[in-house]
């Protein structure tokens, strides 16, 4: 007795269609999940908190307020006292060719 397997015409196509739909569903779910994670991570980043949650820094003071008062400095009255006897000596390092 010989057994002959008879395949119906529409059964193979339906199974293939079910597999394709399942794969499309999981692919869509995966893309949706990844994009949702990207949105969540970008909203929790420093840029979002700086723009939305943290108060902005105070504005800079006006231009005239930036000047600082300094104590007056006066050097010696004669220019010869600045260097003293050492004014004509050329200081060189270990190699006199490289000043």
From Swiss-Prot:
Signal peptide coordinates: 1-21
GO cellular component terms given for this protein: apoplast
Membrane-crossing segments per the record: none
Annotated GO biological process: cell-cell signaling involved in cell fate commitment; maintenance of root meristem identity; phloem development; regulation of cell differentiation
Alphabetical list of InterPro entries matching this protein: CLE_plant
Modified sites of kind Hydroxyproline: 94
Compositional bias ranges of the Basic and acidic residues kind: 77-89
Source superkingdom: Eukaryota
Protein name: CLAVATA3/ESR (CLE)-related protein 17
């Amino acid at each position: 007795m010989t057994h002959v397997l008879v395949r119906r015409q529409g059964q193979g196509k339906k199974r293939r269609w079910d597999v394709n739909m399942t794969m499309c569903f999981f692919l869509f779910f995966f893309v949706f999940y990844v994009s949702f994670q990207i949105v969540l991570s970008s909203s929790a980043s420093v840029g979002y908190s700086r723009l939305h949650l943290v108060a902005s820094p105070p504005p800079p003071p006006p231009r005239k307020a930036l000047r600082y008062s300094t104590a007056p400095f006066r050097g010696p009255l004669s220019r010869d006292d600045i260097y003293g006897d050492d004014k004509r000596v050329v200081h060189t390092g270990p190699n006199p060719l490289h000043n």
